[in-house]
Amino acid sequence: MKKLLLLFVGILSTGIIYAQDVTDAVRYTQDEIQGTARYRGLSGAFGALGGDMSAVSINPAGSAIFNNSHISLSLSNNNIKNDVQYFNGFNTSKESNIDLNQTGAAFVFYNRNSNSDWTKFAFSAAYDKVQNYNNDWLAYGTNSTSIDRYFLDITEKQAIPFGVLKLQPGEYIEEAYADIGSSPAYGYPVQQVFLGYWAGIIDPVNLDNSTNDDETNYFSNTAPADSYYQEFYYASSGYNGKFSLNFATSYKDRLYLGINLNSHFINYDKFTSFYETNNDPDSLTKNIVFENWLSTYGSGFSFQLGAIAKITNDLRLGLSYNSPTWYRIEEELIQGIDSNIADPDIGYISNIINIYPSYNLQTPGKFTGSLAYIFGEYGLISFDYSLKDYSNTKFKPTSDAYFATQNNAINNQLTTASTYKIGGEIRLKQLSLRGGYRLEESPYKNGNTLGDLKGYSLGLGYSFGSFKLDMAFDQAKQTAEYRLYNNSGFPSSASLDSRFTNVTVTAAFNL
């Protein structure tokens, strides 16, 4: 009866630790180009311009540039094409979705005191999608290393008595898996070894169950071979969103000052499925499937300070500071494993939901300097430069031994990165034509784990008076080396060459 119930209701296991790593940290520290079509048409080079709802998300002084109260809403069609190489295998995957990536309103109040130098004040509220996590790809090829090394590597680094992996009298396999995960002495790493054993991938050197409780040496049931055919499927979904309250003011219509108070929220799901097969007649394990479902939820806070100065009537200078974002993150993990010689009850393990203790993540702050020149009624050109030190990313509490190790890895692997954006606009009466280019340097010192991102944009807009309609097309490319598992015994990675294409439409109204 209990087994039947487990088919419908998962067991909750309070895990001790999940293997957060540098990749997880980088995921929540990067900013994508999101926002209005005008903003995207200029590749986000808006720090000294203002007068656009998404410009306010770069420099909070930008809302005071508005002459009238303003509201906008943006829809985007996001497309990703991944060319994936895994050893001798090559595959192309595509993903497409449509979403609401920006909406907001700014309210402008003019000072009725004509003798005051503070000419107007602005308040705005806006939602911006900072990151879109929707992606999927498939890698396949022949590897000289079997997935058995993933499990054996853990046993070689940590003495795990075989008795820990055994079922107690009357204990179900899913209960043992959950108990190991919630044990302060074992946790996630020993759970992986448990999976490897009950899937038939590894065995203790001493096979005598009456004497092998203290055995800590293990061997593989996969025969050594020159190559193993492997497939790895990756699918992720979700977003990183930001809701901002903005306050800004204008001094003599020459200096604009502003502040943003930001509430952040993360909703991220990742599914990976690994498959391996070999035809060696001496191999006991011939087919292996290993699946992981990760769900991440988080919330955070940050603030921004900004200023825009009119050096002349045509030349503008902008400066802004983004504080670190302080996140509180919760994670849940479901695992599944199988093989041709796995225990018949192995499937019940996928009914266990491992719930891990929440942790804090502090992302790095960012400085942005901007310069823009306005050619009267005929157009403009704008340039933004941003600097962010990714090595300042921190898992917290820093007193935690595991997080201290990961923070050292962050410091060793990540570096300071610059972002360059340039954009221009030509105005032909009611019609505006736009274009831009951006370069985002890799946050990694090696430049290979995640390469530089380079992209361009085109856009147009038409003003119907108080109503404006804008459209933008932007495309960017980036390479990456995706390591399948954070495990030195099985360090295999897939090479990705990704192209991101977006079409955005914005409707904007002056109130």
Q: Where are the regions a protein language model picked out?
A:
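Positively charged n-region of N-terminal signal peptides that target proteins for export
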Residues: M1-L4
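Short, linear, compositionally biased motifs with a strong N-terminal bias
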Residues: G10-I11, N67
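Outer-membrane beta-barrel porins/channels
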Residues: Q20-Q34, Y39, V108-L511
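Transmembrane beta-strand segments of Gram-negative outer membrane beta-barrel proteins
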Residues: D21-F46, S63-K81
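Asp/Glu-centered strand-loop micro-motifs enriched in Gly/Pro and often flanked by an aromatic residue
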Residues: R40-A55, Q230-S236
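Outer-membrane beta-barrel translocator/receptor signature
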Residues: L49-I58, A64-W137, T142-N143, G241
